[in-house]
């Protein structure tokens, strides 16, 4: 498969996101975010729609964003992130990655890599901060506060579901006023 320069830059930025310091949406002196107690990866696997996110360089002009997770025989999780560029009916592009569960995290912290640039051993950039009991909505963020995503199994969510996600974000020190809603076709 041929990879364009822009796609290579995209996956490189995603891979480095967990290594970069920054606190876009959290106070520098805030305690680390708190993850959920555990995640059943069998239930978590499948397609998720991005409801909102912190703006970031590797998702500029992305709409119609989805993330698909698939369990692999080696115990890791395959990740396919897809977005359309420009508008919700723009040309789709995808990035393929692999996630490894951080030991001792009960599947709540993962190190996700989208390029041959690995994260430092034991460092997770994908923390599950909220997950409703039915695995229909999730809040995922980076421990340094630079990234935050609201995810759902459907293209839209209820006002109550959004309030629960926002509340979980705020409890973890994330600013919800910085969230950008994602257009889903």
Q: Model regions: which residues?
A:
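A beta-rich soluble binding module of mature secreted/lumenal proteins
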Residues: 3, 19-185
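Bacterial Sec-type N-terminal signal peptides, specifically the leucine/valine-rich hydrophobic h-region
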Residues: 13-16
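Bacterial N-terminal signal peptides that target proteins for export
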Residues: 1-8
